[in-house]
């Protein structure tokens, strides 16, 4: 069984923020594939399923998302290598997309929570959201909406990442990485 997790914060206040790009990708996948909602309170998230594939949007806040993922992982007996986490990354320019297995949290509190609850060797789909001018602005930056110019590209970016995630269901990580990685939004056709 494969588990795709989109990181984000619950509630309409955060819906279109940089931090919620992972939720947008999960929404796209669920819509494209027609996955059905199988959520239960115990999962602490919106959980969808189609065949042997699960899609999770934790409804805990970002900093606590590891608990939701751990619960789903244990309930469905999912191996760590079958978990794919989609998240924002301020260390990448807007629109960049990178894939890797394992690694550090890079200051991302959602990943920090995840690492503490399930370990580090899951696949990460990192989506660049750009970086604020000063480190002290990071929290405000990721909790704000994209700029008008960026907003125009979000739908295409989300579709690209969604297609990459679908490819991960049947292709090797390195093959997906070589085809779907982007250095910036300009690389998106």
Swiss-Prot record:
GO cellular component terms, A-Z: cytoplasm
EC number: 3.1.1.29
Main location: cytoplasm
Compartments (UniProt record): Cytoplasm
Keywords: Cytoplasm, Hydrolase, RNA-binding, tRNA-binding
UniProt superkingdom: Bacteria
Oligomer status and interactors: Monomer.
PANTHER family given in the database record: PEPTIDYL-TRNA HYDROLASE (PTHR17224:SF1)
Family in the record: Belongs to the PTH family.
Name of the protein described by the UniProt record: Peptidyl-tRNA hydrolase
Organism: Sulfurovum sp. (strain NBC37-1)
Gene giving rise to this polypeptide: pth
């Amino acid at each position: 069984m494969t588990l795709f997790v989109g990181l984000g914060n619950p509630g309409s206040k955060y819906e279109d923020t940089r931090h919620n790009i992972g939720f947008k990708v999960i929404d796209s996948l669920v819509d494209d594939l027609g996955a059905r909602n199988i959520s239960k309170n115990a999962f602490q998230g919106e959980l969808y399923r189609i065949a042997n594939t699960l899609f999770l949007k934790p409804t805990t806040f970002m900093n606590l998302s590891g608990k939701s993922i751990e619960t789903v992982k244990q309930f469905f007996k999912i191996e760590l290598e079958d978990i794919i986490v989609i998240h924002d990354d301020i260390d990448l320019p807007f629109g960049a997309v990178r894939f890797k297995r394992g690694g550090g949290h890079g200051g991302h509190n959602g990943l920090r929570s995840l690492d503490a609850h399930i370990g580090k060797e899951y696949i990460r789909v990192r989506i660049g959201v750009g970086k604020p001018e000063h480190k002290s602005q990071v929290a405000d930056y990721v909790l704000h909406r994209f700029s008008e110019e960026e907003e125009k590209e979000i739908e295409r970016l989300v579709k690209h990442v969604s297609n990459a995630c679908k490819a991960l269901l049947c292709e090797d990580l390195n093959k997906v990485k070589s085809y779907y990685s982007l250095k910036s939004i300009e690389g998106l056709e």
